[in-house]
């Protein structure tokens, strides 16, 4: 599984080596997360996965390329571990985090970072919606769950959710 194929397919293909890639997963449709997804899909013979609510964003970068839809609760099996899609709108309408309970991890894209929620100043973003996604979806995960973010350092659910009231204020 490759998350958020953004800038240059070559180094990603080299890092994958000869391993089988189940999917090229886009946590959301902003261009900095999807730029080389079709190219990687072709090079790795793996489908691009994206939530359908981000179709409008996808089409801004890839008007003639299709993707396979992923919805809340969908699962993928990767290297013997199950990952479950959690639809977390707010940063974009189709933002999706991927929870791997056996690995005690969640891949949050731009929904949650060390220090708080993802930015909501971009088109199709909404601050109250991202707060709801974090509190009702990510906030229910165990506190020790490691959050691998779309940009920057990792954190944990517990380290972030304690600041929820500050974000709302």
For every predicted segment, state its role.
Residues 1-19, 97-109:
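Conserved beta-strand hairpin/beta-sheet module of binuclear metal-dependent hydrolase folds
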Residues 2, 45, 120:
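Short, flexible active-site loop motifs that bind/organize anionic cofactors or intermediates
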Residues 2-3, 22-29, 37, 48-52, ...:
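Active-site neighborhood of phospho(di)ester-bond hydrolases with catalytic His/Asp-centered motifs
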Residues 5-8, 30, 123, 153:
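Short beta->alpha junction loops/turns
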Residues 7-82, 162-166:
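Active-site HxH/HxHxD metal-binding segment of metal-dependent hydrolases
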